[in-house]
Each structure stands twice: as structure tokens, then as C-alpha cells.
Amino acid sequence: MGMMQEFKEFAVKGNVVDLAVAVIVGAAFGKIVDSLVQDVIMPVVGKIFGGLDFSNYYIALNNQDPNLTLVEAKKLGAVLAYGNFITIALNFIILAFIIFQMVRLLNKLKRTEPPAPEEPAAVPEDIALLREIRDSLKK
């Protein structure tokens, strides 16, 4: 099964254990992923797109000057801060992918463990007695 297909199944119909792992790992790695996106990935993406800072992308909802920073525009009124949304969405995608890889690894480890050998069932007493009678008749 391909990795993208597994990710789709995980995202669409994950179970409670997957969700619990996601919450725990997400809490632990959230700040790391946030730093990765804000300090490493977004500056590179901004450089590719002409030195733009996505965190300051917004649409002014009450005719503010479009050259203001996001903080200044928020002081003057309502803004639609879609640049921040792009950054947070990228954080989510990276975090979800990391969690998916961890769950995928756990599932792979579960599948590779050999099943425990089954102990033979105890022979019922009447069957054991019949076998003894049979064996004594053969002699």
C-alpha cells in the first residue's frame, strides 16, 4: 500500500489510539514544528517569492492603507490575516505528516512481530481415556 494511500486512510478514518498519539505528539512537537515553519521554511518560501513575509499578508476590511504591517492594520480595524493562516496551515500539514509517520512506524512494528506460538489445547479426560483403551487393545 502506498504511503499517500495510508496517509489518506489515517486522516479519514483514524481510530482513538491514532488520535491519542496525535494529541500527545502534537503537543510535544508543536513548538518545534512552529519554529521549523516560521524560522526555516517560510523565509525560504518568502525569498523565492521576492522576499515577502507571509506573516504580514492581510486584506484590510475597512479601507486601511495596504502598506501597513499587520500589527498596525489590526490597530486601525478588522483585517483578514490570511498570511498567518498560510503559516499555521503549513504547520498543521507538517505536524500531521510527522504524526502519520510515527503511527505508520508503530503499525509496521506491530505487523512484523511474530505471533506467539499457541499452546496445544488440553486433551479432554474422556478422550485421553479412550486413547488409553485403544492403545491397550492394540497390544
UniProtKB/Swiss-Prot annotation:
Transmembrane segments: 10-30, 40-60, 80-100
Disulfide pattern: none
Main subcellular location: membrane
GO cellular component terms, A-Z: plasma membrane
SUPFAM superfamilies hit by this protein: Gated mechanosensitive channel
GO molecular function terms attached to this record: mechanosensitive monoatomic ion channel activity
Coiled-coil region(s): none
A Pfam family recorded for this sequence: MscL
NCBIfam families per UniProt: mscL, PRK00567.1-4, PRK13952.1
Sequence similarity: Belongs to the MscL family.
HAMAP family: MscL
Protein name: Large-conductance mechanosensitive channel
